[in-house]
């Protein structure tokens, strides 16, 4: 007697990711994830990272690569990384300066006050890397001011243990980094997006690199690798035997080209 076919219900999984063009085939249903009935949430990456590491709000989500590394090293990550990278960027476009402070090159940032939305954001880690390797500017050479880009009262989502010579101050609770750069309270801002004072054409705010795309191209030609900024993460509460999860996700994802 023939056996009745076993019908397995698809998993209902919440998936949070930035609104990238390369993700649209998954979000629009053009590409299906095997064994999964996804509920997609397109959100700002910063919100995703905060909710993921503070509250583990999602089954699958885009994760800050540096934040994931810090949490994993501490043994407290609620997610397991999947080696697919939704966002890669060269971050030479991530440094915005006051152009009335005598800052002609990265070396001139020494002794300055630089705003960052979070010290350990992957974009900021990459920037600190090439500032030190290419220009000799160490993290201890500046004063870091942590705060919200456009909203006041932003919190660091994870606890950091920094070297004693690295100074990180909190921005005033009533101030934003964009506002402080516009008013001259900061000499520069580093972050994954342009502050509104820059996009609105403030005359005293500009890129550090006069041609940031050209600087990024030169960097890539010299070193021949791109920078991964985010990865997929699957909730650690899911057993690896569950329909091969998270195996279906990498199968249907493609990392962007450098």
From Swiss-Prot:
Keywords: Aromatic hydrocarbons catabolism, Decarboxylase, Lyase, Plasmid. This is 4,5-dihydroxyphthalate decarboxylase. Gene3D superfamilies: Periplasmic binding protein-like II. GO terms for molecular function: 4,5-dihydroxyphthalate decarboxylase activity. It comes from Pseudomonas putida. GO terms for biological process: phthalate catabolic process. Pathway: Xenobiotic degradation; phthalate degradation; 3,4-dihydroxybenzoate from phthalate: step 3/3. It is an enzyme of class 4 (lyase). To P.testosteroni DHP decarboxylase. Induction: Induced by phthalate and repressed by glucose. It catalyses: 4,5-dihydroxyphthalate + H(+) = 3,4-dihydroxybenzoate + CO2. It comes from the Bacteria. Its EC number is 4.1.1.55. The keyword Lipid metabolism does not apply. Coiled coil: none annotated. InterPro entries: SsuA/THI5 (IPR015168).
């Amino acid at each position: 007697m023939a056996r009745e076919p076993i019908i397995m219900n698809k998993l209902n999984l919440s998936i949070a990711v930035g609104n990238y063009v390369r993700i649209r085939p998954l979000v629009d249903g053009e590409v299906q994830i095997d064994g999964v009935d996804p509920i997609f949430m397109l959100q700002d990456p910063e919100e995703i990272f905060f909710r993921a590491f503070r509250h583990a709000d999602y089954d699958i989500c885009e994760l800050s690569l540096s934040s994931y590394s810090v949490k994993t090293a501490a043994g407290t990550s609620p997610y397991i990384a999947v080696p697919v990278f939704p966002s890669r960027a060269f971050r030479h476009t991530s440094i915005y300066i006051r152009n009335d402070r005598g800052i002609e090159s990265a070396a001139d940032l020494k002794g300055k006050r630089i705003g960052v939305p979070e010290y350990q954001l992957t974009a900021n880690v990459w920037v600190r890397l090439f500032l030190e390797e290419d220009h000799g500017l160490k993290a201890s050479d500046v004063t870091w001011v942590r705060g919200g880009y456009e909203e006041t009262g932003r919190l660091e989502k994870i606890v950091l243990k920094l070297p004693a010579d690295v100074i990180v101050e909190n921005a005033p609770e009533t101030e934003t980094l964009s506002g402080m750069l516009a008013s001259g309270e900061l000499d520069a801002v580093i972050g994954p997006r342009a502050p509104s004072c820059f996009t609105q054409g403030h005359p005293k705010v500009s890129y550090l690199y006069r041609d940031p795309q050209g600087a990024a191209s030169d960097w890539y030609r010299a070193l021949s690798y791109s920078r991964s900024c985010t990865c997929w993460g699957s909730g650690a509460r899911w057993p690896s035997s569950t329909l091969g999860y998270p195996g279906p996700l990498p199968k249907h994802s493609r990392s962007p080209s450098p």
